[in-house]
Amino acid sequence: MADPFGFLKYERKDNPYRPVNERIKDFEELQTTLSVEERQKQAARCMNCGIPFCHEGTFYGGGRAVSGCPNDNLIPEWNALIYKGDFRRAFERLTRTNPLPEMTGRVCPAPCEKACTEGLNGSGVTIHDNERFIIDNAFEEGWVADSGRPIERTGFKVAVVGSGPAGLSAAWRLNQLGHSVTVFERSDRFGGLLMYGIPNMKLDKKIVQRRIDTMASIGINFVANTEIGRDITAEELLEKFDRVILATGASVPRDLDIPGRDLKGIRFAVDFLTETTKNLLDSDTHELPPL
């Protein structure tokens, strides 16, 4: 358990937003982070409940709603480790259930916080921000790459089709097990919707690229601009690899048959986000022109 009286001593404190007059001038992430000392205080608010509803994802309505973490993250454990300053073990516990916490620590809607018992009598623990702190600190310390290196290679070759969150997660875990992994992506950059479907101010693309670079550094192969069925056939994949994992994502939009759908300027969201992000990444600056 963290501080037994932490939930009484400390108020909830979220990661602060950058000043408005600063953040309207660029496409950088909206939020900054707390100091290490402040982060430990936030972790101290976790009571390590006898039945921690935060860490167990419970689905309702046929899977349409969820309470608690769908990943079953070991939240009370790594909150206590943050409070104690044992950031290495906190990282190990976090990545036991979540291979890409730098993504979820930024864009997850955090149903864990809604399920936090502390929320019944005040504000829930800042689980979302605590998760981000653990993984960002781990990257700074150089722990992430080491955690993904296998002890030995199995000689088993696996192709992963698609480099979105599912494909990257699969590639990371398979590489840890010692298999030789190659990730195929039809786009010019890796990351899928992490790269092109989420605005930069929510998930800086440097964060996504950092993960890709880390994976490449520990032996995972990446092949861009390659569409299965056009540039390489499924039969060729099956000949070259022992197994093939399809993680193609959900890039095909669902249209709406409603009045006004064909009006000028009405576009699919992912198409719009992809174009704007590509323009941003291909430009020389992330700053906006003066108003």
Please give the residue ranges for each predicted region.
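Glycine-centered loop/turn positions within well-structured domains
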Residues: 76, 88, 114, 254, ...
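Residues forming the flavin
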Residues: 1-37, 41, 131-291
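A broad detector of the eukaryotic-type serine/threonine protein kinase catalytic domain
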Residues: 74, 95, 99, 113, ...
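A ubiquitous short alpha-helical element
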Residues: 9-12, 58-64, 98, 205-206
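Short, cysteine/histidine-rich loop/knuckle motifs that typically chelate Zn2+
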Residues: 48, 56, 68-71, 115-118
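Conserved phosphate/pyrophosphate-binding and hydrolysis machinery centered on Walker-type P-loop NTPases
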Residues: 59, 124, 231
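Ferredoxin-type iron-sulfur electron-transfer modules in oxidoreductases and energy-metabolism complexes
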Residues: 25-40, 52, 62-67, 71-106, ...
